[in-house]
UniProtKB/Swiss-Prot annotation:
Organism: Alkalilimnicola ehrlichii (strain ATCC BAA-1101 / DSM 17681 / MLHE-1)
Single GO biological process annotation from the record: chorismate biosynthetic process
Transferase among keywords: yes
Listed pathway(s): Metabolic intermediate biosynthesis; chorismate biosynthesis; chorismate from D-erythrose 4-phosphate and phosphoenolpyruvate: step 6/7
Residues given in the record as 3-phosphoshikimate binding sites: K21, S22, R26, S167, Q169, D315, K342
One Pfam match: EPSP_synthase
Protein name: 3-phosphoshikimate 1-carboxyvinyltransferase
InterPro entries linked to this entry: Enolpyruvate_Tfrase_dom, Enolpyruvate_Tfrase_sf, EPSP_synthase, EPSP_synthase_CS, RNA3'P_cycl/enolpyr_Trfase_a/b
Name of the gene encoding the protein in the UniProt record: aroA
Amino acid sequence: MEFHVRPGGALRGRLRVPGDKSISHRAIMLGALAEGETRISGFLEGADALATLRTFRAMGVDIDGPHQGRVTVQGVGLHGLRAPDGPLDLGNSGTSMRLLCGLLAGQSFDTTLTGDASLSRRPMRRVIDPLTAMGAVIESGQGGTAPLTVRGGQPLHGIDYELPVASAQVKSALLLAGLYARGRTCVTEPAPTRDHTERMLAGFGYPVRQEGRRVCIEGGGRLRGGEIDVPADISSAAFFLVGASIAEGSDITLEHVGMNPTRTGVVDILRLMGADIQVQNEREVGGEPVADLRVRSAPLKGVAIPEALVPLAIDEFPVLFVAAACAEGETLLTGAEELRVKESDRIAVMAEGLTTLGVTAEPQPDGMRIVGQPDWGGGRVHSHGDHRIAMAFTMAATRAREPIEIEDCANVNTSFPGFVELAGDAGVALTRGDAEGRAQQRSDSP
């Protein structure tokens, strides 16, 4: 599938983007391991979160839904999962694979985890090694990639682990394994990362001890089911934050956005660049801060992005590169080598696409240097099957002089089902077409 985007167009209106992907994954996982019923609203019905849902159904968990974002999970307790009939296919979801490695390490049965071609290239050694230190046995493909087989029946013991690279997925995998481990499991981060696992464990009644950048749990506790309201995903909102910032005449409000302080780096970086973002109607829902974000177009300036903000915006850099491309002056990103091992090499792929559009974008080993300009041409860019790349270049068209065609966009549904329709409602002139360029569906501004 391809996206064809006509240039220009202000973004206007009130929008609610789909539910948070990170929270949706964890709601299913913890709800399945809890005792009693868990009722979820706002669940993200994207391919990644649905892969997690199917996985727990395959392990004997009764799950009703999703029905318009509502899911009911009948928990089986920490030791109630059953062996699946065959390998568990996680599609494109790295979150599912890494977190399940920790969770499945404490089960009594063997499980094989597989994924698509992109996921099968992503590094898993970073989670396999510390889990092995806890007593887990995990077999991988050459180079520590999927498919992975997690051997059951292994006695786990707690460890005190210092993450060499900030990673919420690795931290979460170790904490989930720690539920089954003898003694205490502690993880120390070099920099703050998203803390949904810690917050949600506590919300399910499991004691969690936080000491600065060190988080600890004791094995042998219990989880209690309850209610979870999943806020809108700030990573999905980011495309509209940037689109409205760079498209002249824009004024949009994004509703019920999750504002977890470990996720708001994109707002902080855009404000450093001069973006006009107002945080309104702040409140707390289910232990997570939530707000409405009003965004109006504003002239942006290039900045040196503080490395302390990198882990807090790691998924948003593709669209932040688009913001940098139309900012006055130079933007420099360093300390973001993690971008090279996402669904694609996001540094190389974004530099390639921006260069195609006529932007000066110089990839660095751990980041990028971008020289902004008032507008740019169009052209044909390749997303390499990366959902965030495809959506980032969609927003780039709001400042282009000519149409932009984006190849290989089917994976947008992994995180943002309904993106084409919502972007059209906001004012983006976006057409979805097949590989031969034939239009299939049009979502134009009025």
